[in-house]
Amino acid sequence: SAQLRFEDAGITKRALDYAGKERNTSGEQIAQILKAMTPLYLAQYNMPELQNMVSAALNTYLDNPQNLTVTAQPPKSVPFPMIMGAAMGAPNTLPGLLGVTVTAND
């Protein structure tokens, strides 16, 4: 298994505020734009479960930035050639094959 975790120490609000200032709007508006655009951007990859999971986690995180976690925990060992085959032939199956989850504020 593998896990990538980001713990916010205030940088998210500062980054959103900075991005908003650069675009003559607020950090809150930038957060709303990100929340709206994320599902649209992810839809092109044809991974609806991952799209919904990422969108829900991002919405939760942007509403109250604490932490964001990406975990890959396959139910059983996955041989590397199987991962490569899925990546080349059916990339939309990778999140399920690898047991990918994306969560926020847990």
Each model region followed by its residue ranges:
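Glycine-rich, small/hydroxylated-residue low-complexity segments
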Residues: S1-D106
